[in-house]
Amino acid sequence: MKKSLFAGVGVILGIIAFCLVFIRLEPATTTNIRTYQHEENEKADSLIGTTEVGADGEVSSAEFVTHLPLFILDVDGQEFPNIYKSTEDESKQYRDENITDPYISATITLIDNDNSQNHITDEAEFVNHGKIKIRGNSSRNFPKKQYGFKLLDENGEELEKSLLGMEADEDWVLCDSIVDLTLMRNYLVYCVGGQIFPYTPEAKFCEVVMKEGDSYNYLGVYLLTETVKKAEGRVDIETFKENDRALSYLICRDRYNYTVPMLSTWASDSQICYGYFSVKYPKETELTEEIKGRIEEELSTVEQVLYSDDMSVFRTYSQYLDVDSFVDYFVINEYFENYDAGLHSTYYYKDSARKLTIGPLWDYDNCLDNYREGLANSEYTSFVGQPWFEKLLQDPVFVDKVCRRYEELRKTILSDAYIETFIDETADYLGNAAYRDRSRWYEAYQAGYSLKEFADVYGLTVNRTRDSYEEELLRFKDTVQMHANWMDDNLYPTLSAFVREDVSDNGVAFRSTLAIVLMIIFLVSIVLVNRVRSGR
């Protein structure tokens, strides 16, 4: 009996040792279940309705029809407050301190029929007397505005409501900038990136008209998008209580904004890296100086570790950061050429029992060579210079994780076939709505928002504006594929060039030590089995 027991234990130990030593450990893979609107509603007739809307935007309430959910906004003739003022030479804008509330009252009507044929005159699925504001920094000056609206109940209190099947909340965003002629950059990244990034906002296409007296003005195709906030169904971290020893918070790196609570951290104060952190949670009314100071202290510790010249200190960064989230953030943003990420609209959150995590994803209008003031180079990586990442990439363990994660995702949600199919199917789903939006805004786009021409690395002038929606989609797909193909061949050698030789690969060292220990166990198990067999 004992001999059989020893033999069994020996075999089991041998198998475990073999698996752990010879099977390469891969980074943890997290997949979030996420449905795509264009797949859920693929049977909708996307060719209904006109393809042309005049530049003035006026549409007939009796004739307008769309297969997309339809929002009707009515502000009863009110003007949106201009919350920014300009300097005398109009070179800079600053927030007007006299305007404390950017919202105006609005009636928000949603029409979303089961047959996917939505008319302005149809019975509404939902009507709310809430409030609305214009969103954005530079984008607030675009002719096609982006909006944020808040749902209210009959007493003027915030009302949580599910819209288009998304998690209930009172705060919603209508976005899709005039600068994205494909209409799908945000949708693509939120859907695909949301597969691996928890709390990434869901977004659903819709069309929007503004009621102006007895007339209706067509505003275009929009994405109804969840906001990034601490809430159930959003960034669902624990509710922080003042006496809690561990902190829960949501912060955002961006430009300095004195109208919201800003943090003073070691790196921002010393200007070691770009950007400032604002606090999104706890709310301003709950953010005491003590809590604010504790958050600043935690972040300063992380920054001092990352930017330390003492490698024994630097190597402890994994004690503070959810490293896998930073790996995924690098891969997604480099793949989609979103070089605003890490600088602007970059969110981080911390649950009381967990490490600091980067995410969720937000704001991709300018990704994939869609930045007006600069030409993206598909044969280059720019994310290596972003705050914190410029230090993380000095660690060979982090570089190894990034490259292996990229290789893994290229076989699934970042494969050429997956992305191209996603784009084609989304374009088919948008159908005539995409042409309506283009006819409404393309003239304004050409007048002041088209992508500037630049010389590429070979000295050739590149014109990035296309004459048709089909050509725009082709450029979109080509841009994705060209950069991905370059990453396939060059990501590892490029990132390896940033690795510091004096950074000991503690991860590899640990795995090597573990391998030796387990190899010994494996050999001992063989000896035990042989002894049992020989009867000793």
Spans of features found by a protein language model:
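N-terminal module-boundary/linker segments of secreted carbohydrate-active enzymes
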Residues: L25-Q117, D502
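Hydrophobic secretory-pathway targeting helix
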Residues: S4-P27
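Middle-to-C-terminal accessory/interaction subdomains
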Residues: V21-T31, P81, K280-L343, Y349-F522, ...
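Beta-rich nucleic-acid/ligand-interaction surfaces
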Residues: F205-N217
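Internal "kinase-insert"/substrate-recognition segments embedded within catalytic cores
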Residues: N155-G156, D169, I196-P201, Y216-D328
